[in-house]
C-alpha cells in the first residue's frame, strides 16, 4: 500500500508539476481552496481534470472569510496588474505587482489546514508548488518559510509530517522542463489570475507561463486571448 500524501492543488502549472513528481509513489488527496479568488471557477475545473488524470481524490475547502479580510486584487474588483515583458525581470516592478495580488497569510492558512487533514488521515507529506521565481517576491514561497513551517510542524503535530516543495530551487523554465520530464499534465493546468475561459495572456501569471514554455523549448498548448 502506498503512503498517503496531501497536495495543495490550485490547478496551476507549479502545483500540477509538483504533484506529478510524487504521483506514482503516493496515494494523494488534493485540496483546492476557494477563498473567493476571481479564477476559482477555472481553478476548480482544471484541478478536477488533473485529479482525474492522476487518479487522485479531490476535495474543495471553502474559506469565504479569507476574501472578506483580504484587500487583494485577486479577491476584489481591483484591476489585476498587466506588467510588460521587461517588468518580469524588474525587481521593483515585480514587488509592486506582488503586493497587488498578495493575499496575506494565504500559504500559512493553506498549510495549516492541509496539516490538519494530513494528520487526520495519517498522510506522510504535504506537497506544495512553491518555486524560486515566486520566492523572490512572495515571502511565503521561500526556503526560509518552508524550513520554518516544517519546524513548526515538529512542535505542533503528533505525527511526523513534512511539507515537500520539490520546485523550491526552480525557475518557471525549470518547472516546465521538469513537468515535461515527469509527464505532468501541464496542458490542462490553469495559471490565469483573471479567470477567463482561456488564459488572458497579459496578467503576470500568464506572461511567466508563456515565457517559461518558450525558454524551455516545450510546446505550449495553452490558449491565450492575447
From Swiss-Prot:
**Keywords attached to this entry:** ATP-binding, Ligase, Metal-binding, Nucleotide-binding, Zinc
Identify the EC number(s).
Answer: 6.3.4.20
InterPro entries linked to this entry: QueC (IPR018317), Rossmann-like_a/b/a_fold (IPR014729)
Q: In which pathway does it act?
A: Purine metabolism; 7-cyano-7-deazaguanine biosynthesis
- Quote one Gene Ontology molecular function term: ATP binding
The coiled-coil regions, if any, are none
Q: Does the keyword Ligase apply?
A: yes
**Cofactor annotation comment:** Binds 1 zinc ion per subunit.
Pfam families named among the record's database cross-references: QueC
SUPFAM superfamilies (alphabetical): Adenine nucleotide alpha hydrolases-like
Cofactor(s) the protein requires to work:
Zn(2+)
Binding positions for ATP? Answer: 9-19
Q: Which domain of life is it from?
A: Archaea
Which family is this protein grouped under?
Answer: Belongs to the QueC family.
Q: What does this protein do?
A: Catalyzes the ATP-dependent conversion of 7-carboxy-7-deazaguanine (CDG) to 7-cyano-7-deazaguanine (preQ(0)).
UniProt name for this protein? 7-cyano-7-deazaguanine synthase
What organism is recorded for this protein? Methanosphaera stadtmanae (strain ATCC 43021 / DSM 3091 / JCM 11832 / MCB-3)
Amino acid at each position: 500500500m502506498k503512503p498517503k500524501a496531501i497536495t495543495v492543488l490550485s490547478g496551476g502549472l507549479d502545483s500540477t508539476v509538483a504533484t506529478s513528481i510524487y504521483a506514482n509513489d503516493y496515494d494523494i488527496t488534493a485540496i483546492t481552496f476557494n477563498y473567493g479568488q476571481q479564477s476559482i471557477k477555472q481553478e476548480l475545473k482544471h484541478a478536477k481534470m488533473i485529479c482525474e488524470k492522476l487518479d487522485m481524490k479531490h476535495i474543495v475547502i471553502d474559506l469565504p472569510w479569507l476574501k472578506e479580510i483580504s484587500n487583494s486584487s485577486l479577491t476584489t474588483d481591483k484591476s489585476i496588474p498587466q506588467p510588460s515583458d521587461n517588468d518580469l525581470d524588474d525587481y521593483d516592478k515585480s514587488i509592486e505587482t506582488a503586493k497587488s495580488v498578495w493575499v496575506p497569510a494565504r500559504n500559512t492558512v493553506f498549510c495549516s489546514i492541509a496539516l490538519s487533514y494530513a494528520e487526520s488521515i495519517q498522510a506522510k507529506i504535504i506537497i506544495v508548488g512553491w518555486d524560486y521565481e515566486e520566492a523572490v517576491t512572495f515571502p511565503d514561497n521561500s526556503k526560509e518559510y518552508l524550513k520554518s513551517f516544517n519546524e513548526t510542524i515538529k512542535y505542533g503535530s503528533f505525527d511526523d509530517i513534512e511539507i515537500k516543495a520539490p520546485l523550491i530551487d526552480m525557475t518557471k523554465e525549470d518547472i516546465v522542463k521538469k513537468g515535461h520530464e515527469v509527464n505532468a499534465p501541464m496542458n490542462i493546468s490553469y495559471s490565469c489570475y483573471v479567470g477567463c475561459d482561456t488564459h488572458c495572456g497579459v496578467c503576470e501569471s500568464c506572461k511567466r507561463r508563456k515565457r517559461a514554455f518558450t525558454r524551455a523549448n516545450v510546446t505550449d498548448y495553452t490558449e491565450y486571448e492575447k
